[in-house]
C-alpha cells in the first residue's frame, strides 16, 4: 500500500481509539491485518431506533489511493435497513461514493454510518424490499428491524408474534436465516413466505 495511505490510516486508527465515542462504547475499530489495509469496525445501534442495543460489525478495506478515494465498507452483521443490503451488507451512503472528501476520516465514516441507522433515506435505497416496507408499513418495518437487531446484533428481545412465526417455519425443517428473510420480505405472511421457501 502507498506510504501516504498507511501513514494516514495509522493516524486515523489512533484518533478512533482515543475518541470520546470509543470511550462511550459507541464506535470501535480493530486491525485485521498488519498492513492497515483491512480493518474491522463496530458501531452501536443508536438510541430510540429499532437498532438500539445491537452491535454492528463492519468490514473496512482501505484502497491504495486512500485518502483520495473512500474506504470500501460493508456491514458484516445482518441488518434490516433501506440503505443497506439485507443480503450482502452493501451500503448506499453518499460519502462512501461521490461525496467523499480527502479530509474525511475513519471516525467520520463510523459516525456517519451510525447516523444513517437513525435516519434512513428510503428514496435512495440499497434494498428495495426494505425501503418499500419502510414507506408502506412503518410499524412493521420497525418490528422487523428490531427482530433482526435481536437475532443478528444481540439487541434485547423483540416481537413475540414474529418470533413464533419463525419458530413454526423452522419446525417444518427450513433454515432459520432463510425463514427470517422470507417472512421479513413477505410482510410476515406465513403462507407467501412458505411458498417462497419452497420455491428456493
From Swiss-Prot:
EC numbers, comma separated: 2.3.2.23
Gene Ontology BP term (one): positive regulation of peptidyl-threonine phosphorylation
An annotated Gene Ontology molecular function: ATP binding
InterPro entries according to UniProt: UBA, UBA-like_sf, UBE2K_UBA, UBQ-conjugat_E2_core, UBQ-conjugating_AS, UBQ-conjugating_enzyme/RWD
Active-site residues, as the UniProt record annotates them: 92 (glycyl thioester intermediate)
Main location: cytoplasm
Disulfide pattern: none
Cross-link (Glycyl lysine isopeptide (Lys-Gly) (interchain with G-Cter in SUMO1)) at residue(s): 14
Tissues showing expression: Expressed in all tissues tested, including spleen, thymus, prostate, testis, ovary, small intestine, colon, peripheral blood leukocytes, T-lymphocytes, monocytes, granulocytes and bone marrow mononuclear cells. Highly expressed in brain, with highest levels found in cortex and striatum and at lower levels in cerebellum and brainstem.
Annotated ranges, domain UBC core: 4-154
N6-acetyllysine PTM positions: 14
Keyword Cytoplasm among record annotations: yes
Modified sites of kind N-acetylalanine: 2
Name recorded for this polypeptide: Ubiquitin-conjugating enzyme E2 K
Species this protein is from: Homo sapiens
